[in-house]
């Protein structure tokens, strides 16, 4: 009979008996005064019915239950291997069987004597007969052992939690909740919600602390009490831990990840190792449960005792993105001691099984011949799981046979999954009890196979712990534990305060903090940070500025990573880089700003943050003047902390891919008067420089986007309210594609287009963000246009129109003012390669017609490779970007062309396009702009010098040759390239890999200790009168990477260029 049907019948029978009993009681009261005969009949019927009900219940419930107990005794028990190693709770009527595990440790052989507990077969004999030991005297086929050992820890792919209930792990009755409220000594059972543990980046190696309790509060015991009384404070006993690994790799990828859980309080791997699991890094999240038998006293923080070490393999995942998120759920007991709780058979079985498998997994050899079952199947051969670090340095011994190294002893260094190398593992199993025939010969390392660890294919482990003829070498050690466990007040680096005057203007600097001065401040951990070579994490700025809600002003805090000049300036376009935050103190009196000191690395250093003149800067400045100013100056306080656990994504862009958060652009500021309604149209083109009045600023976004012709991406518009939040209004933003902007005349037309409404309110964020998906734009968005005037819209893909739903109104005086910025989001795709347009550092005026002194004779060489067709990123290998140009001008040089005078002449230029050039006119192509706006760079650059001879000289009359040399630093440094052009006209080319001290990146435009200035080129003409033009071109190789943004380059126009176009409706 099925158990579910039996349970239903039992419930129905109990209800019938209760109804008969109540009916009998009611009839008894009714016939109490009638007759004795009725009472007798009522008793008889009741007893008769109860008799048959009890018989039926015994036959169908009690008898099967007793039969199940008898058949499940040890005499009749057979193991069901399908469910023997699972941690799933059993059914209602299913009996759980206990298991006994015995450990037999055979003594070593002594002088050839074989004891009764020695293995029956040697390792060589077992290899021949294809069998393996399971006890000292029993063997089974190796295939059977591998099949059963493969179910070490099953990673379950599920969208729901698989953590057992409290009732499955501890014996509880229905009065437990009431008893726990009345008694102080009653245990408290807690099942936590899902707690975020951390994330593993695409780099594929991380260590994470596993939180046991959601919020730890230390229980303080009176020191005056005896030890036995103080020891009875509440302990934390962890029954089960569920780890959830949510991978973000592509579903069709083979990226795998593995983790090892261990107790940090132990130093040996046998005591510390709690278990491991492996999973794929894509698809449905993987769940795995551990029963760690973990107890923590009241005086220790349980959230610092367990640690998870995660690694990934076969990963083509980008390091700047998150590969997997790790979270945990725990079931623990807070009690006075283990005697206060009663564990179920299920928990006892699971705990014992975890201990046995952990011991088998982390054996002395640390080599596992089987791995967890996975679906779908993934390749985990020779998977290297990190363990507690412990290595021994060995010194070389010089003999007449050569230099020999004693074998390094690896104790708890790593665990290897699915070892596929030689089956003969040193010091494993029965082999460690064999008598060594040639002890002296086996003592030294003669080949790779003689080493104790055979895991790493690159050979890093083979070289670990070996020295070459060194004696008395002292190793310097550092430990990051002190900075990682410090509280926030101890992590303070610098603090200060300032005032916001009443006469500020947009761009006024409120306060400036140069990061190269951090090492000189007397903070708590400054001395320790000065000692460390790499400080993990980021920096955080906390800012507090209290103003009345009737006031309003826009503020911005920005991190200027590459400050290439001693004069910081106050230009908003130059200082608002990739890492900044804008807010209104009337809405947000308290803000936090976290930034990455080195945008190309996950660490920073106190002594590599620039020099006295060229140091990275944290600057707080105004975005606007006071809008309804206060009566007195407002005060602002700030503090800088280091955050060792907060690791922001790297800001690294390649020619084929760039993260979306690196693309930002400041559009401008709009003001709306009260009682009026107006609409504005504007263009968001990240390939154009930022324009603010007469000032034009090139940023990393405009430089990188200038390399391409078209883009497809989501666009987010940020509206930061700078006026008082008590001045309100409702606005709409719509996108008008193509030339349809010319037909917009009323709100009805705008409402028929893709649009969204928004407003500002007090008590929320200062910024409203609106996303326009890329599906809204239809066609690709143009990037490589050069006309800065918004009135000329011939080559504009589309316009955004901002219009009012209602008139601005308030009891206060003034205008509603906000600042507009644009940024990209989601997956960005660039199409086509653009060689850019010939702008110069001396460019004045607006548009492409005013201020140009490029006469028709040099149009062709300057516009070399312009107007590319529809292209792919592979075209970067063929497109050359113009960098510098020289043209012969009559009467400018000594001598005369007609008299055939000879006058040598030199052209000099630094190859990053900076101002230190001589006789070369710098052409600001996308190549030059990108080199001048990125903070870091590494990769190969190619350069070409194209010379055109004058047609006035016949070939037989030429006496000149052109020599090109490239130097490491200045012209007084050594040359790394030298070439001679023997023909009248021709081309010379060379390449150079740019490297630097910070993870291989070179700092561009600012000083990092150990870096040097950029390369310089020298073009020497034997006779200047024989040449017409000399043009310098640059080209990117496919391995080029750019990181971060330094202070943007800028120039001024003759007249102001409007950004917004007013539309009256």
Swiss-Prot record:
<keyword id="KW-0945">Host-virus interaction</keyword>
<dbReference type="GO" id="GO:0003723">
    <property type="term" value="F:RNA binding"/>
</dbReference>
<keyword id="KW-0167">Capsid protein</keyword>
<dbReference type="GO" id="GO:0044165">
    <property type="term" value="C:host cell endoplasmic reticulum"/>
</dbReference>
<keyword id="KW-1038">Host endoplasmic reticulum</keyword>
<keyword id="KW-1142">T=3 icosahedral capsid protein</keyword>
<keyword id="KW-0941">Suppressor of RNA silencing</keyword>
<feature type="site" description="Cleavage; by viral protease">
    <location>
        <begin position="868"/>
        <end position="869"/>
    </location>
</feature>
<keyword id="KW-0916">Viral movement protein</keyword>
<keyword id="KW-0238">DNA-binding</keyword>
<dbReference type="InterPro" id="IPR003181">
    <property type="entry name" value="Como_LCP"/>
</dbReference>
<keyword id="KW-0813">Transport</keyword>
<keyword id="KW-0946">Virion</keyword>
<dbReference type="Pfam" id="PF02247">
    <property type="entry name" value="Como_LCP"/>
</dbReference>
<keyword id="KW-1090">Inhibition of host innate immune response by virus</keyword>
<keyword id="KW-1031">Host cell junction</keyword>
<dbReference type="GO" id="GO:0003677">
    <property type="term" value="F:DNA binding"/>
</dbReference>
<protein>
    <recommendedName>
        <fullName>RNA2 polyprotein</fullName>
    </recommendedName>
</protein>
<keyword id="KW-0694">RNA-binding</keyword>
<dbReference type="GO" id="GO:0046740">
    <property type="term" value="P:transport of virus in host, cell to cell"/>
</dbReference>
<dbReference type="InterPro" id="IPR029053">
    <property type="entry name" value="Viral_coat"/>
</dbReference>
<dbReference type="InterPro" id="IPR003182">
    <property type="entry name" value="RNA2_polyprotein"/>
</dbReference>
<keyword id="KW-0899">Viral immunoevasion</keyword>
<feature type="site" description="Cleavage; by viral protease">
    <location>
        <begin position="466"/>
        <end position="467"/>
    </location>
</feature>
<dbReference type="GO" id="GO:0052170">
    <property type="term" value="P:symbiont-mediated suppression of host innate immune response"/>
</dbReference>
<dbReference type="GO" id="GO:0039617">
    <property type="term" value="C:T=3 icosahedral viral capsid"/>
</dbReference>
<dbReference type="GO" id="GO:0005198">
    <property type="term" value="F:structural molecule activity"/>
</dbReference>
<dbReference type="Pfam" id="PF02248">
    <property type="entry name" value="Como_SCP"/>
</dbReference>
<dbReference type="GO" id="GO:0044219">
    <property type="term" value="C:host cell plasmodesma"/>
</dbReference>
